[in-house]
Design a protein with these regions (language model features):
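Short, acidic/polar
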Residues: 50-61, 105-114, 204-209
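Conserved, mostly hydrophobic/aromatic
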Residues: 42, 62, 70, 87, ...
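Gly/Pro-rich active-site loop or hairpin
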Residues: 59-60, 68, 169-175, 198-255, ...
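Active-site mouth loops of central-metabolism enzymes
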Residues: 43-53, 98-104, 136
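C-terminal segment of N-terminal export signals and the immediately downstream linker at the start
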Residues: 23-52, 61
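N-terminal secretory signal peptides and thylakoid transit peptides that target proteins
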Residues: 1-16
Length: 282
């Protein structure tokens, strides 16, 4: 919900007048509040151990917590038709799936068929194989690969995105890989899913990235933790990342997926993180 500035100022003035004349605005309605995340999602990698043996139970519990969206990273040996029915049963949607780029290139027919059945909009590359990109020239080749694969993804009726880790905001030679990717990929074809924690962990400022590349980030991985040099992840809202400021400046974000790589109690993490985000105004 977007605040109407004129209505906000009028309400603020009326409330101030009431306080001045009566000492308290007895019975007055609350001031308009900021935006909230309408449909909070979660990356199922967070709960991968339990999901591998009880995906229906995981989806049921996430739905009870309040989640509306999930992002897959594999289907835990369930056929796409079963996944679709599980999601429908629990009032969930799965707008995105993490799929390895090599799998998209070598098994695209199956990838696209599963995505079509389940209802994915986004085919998101979660990372690159270790060691594949270490130099500026490597990243240029990756950018060309992204353009090529994204063209194929679009032709099948889906959208292509890349999820960052900390490597793309660390210098390769004298340049940042993210600058190469942004410069050399087609903005119509290639979008980005910012993992906020990994951006910070790599030394980047999410606000600066959003300002430098407006419109390129379409999804966020909402992950919290301590500042570098440590690599300690926390419940969302319990770390040091200022999500309120980031969300307020993140224009054009379509999906917000909570994630933690290895929480001690994944479902407790999911519940605590949902509670924080559901109360966050920005």
């Amino acid at each position: 919900m977007t605040i109407d500035r004129r209505r906000f100022l009028a309400t603020l003035g009326a409330s101030a007048a009431a306080l001045a004349t009566r000492g308290a605005a007895v019975g007055a309605g609350p001031l308009p509040r900021g935006k909230k995340v309408d449909r909070i999602g979660i990356q199922l990698y967070t709960l991968r151990k339990r999901a591998s043996t009880d995906l229906p139970g995981v989806l049921a519990e996430l739905s009870r917590i309040g989640y509306k969206e999930v992002e897959f990273a594999g289907y835990y040996k369930h056929p796409a038709t079963e996944i679709r029915e599980m999601l429908k049963q629990h009032g969930l949607t799965a707008p995105s799936a993490h799929v390895a780029i090599d799998l998209i290139e070598t098994q695209s027919a199956q990838v696209f068929e599963d995505a079509r059945i389940i209802g994915h909009e986004w085919i998101t590359v979660p990372s690159l194989p270790r060691g594949r990109a270490t130099t500026a020239e490597d990243w240029q080749r990756i950018a060309a690969q992204f353009n090529r694969v994204a063209t194929h993804v679009k032709s099948a009726g889906f959208r292509f995105a890349f999820h960052n880790h900390n490597d793309i905001v660390r210098t390769a030679g004298d340049v940042l890989p993210i600058d190469i990717l942004m410069r050399e990929t087609d903005p119509v074809l290639v979008a980005f899913q910012m993992d906020i924690y990994w951006a910070v962990n790599g030394g980047a400022d999410p606000l600066e990235l959003l300002a430098r590349y407006p419109g390129r980030f379409k999804m966020l991985h909402v992950k919290d933790g301590q500042r570098p040099p440590g690599d300690v992840q926390t419940d969302v809202g319990a770390g040091t990342i200022d999500f309120k400021s980031i969300f307020a400046r993140a224009k054009g974000i379509e999906h917000y997926f909570v994630e933690s790589d290895s929480p001690a109690d994944p479902m407790a993490f999911a519940a605590a993180s949902y509670k924080y985000l559901s109360h966050l105004d920005f």
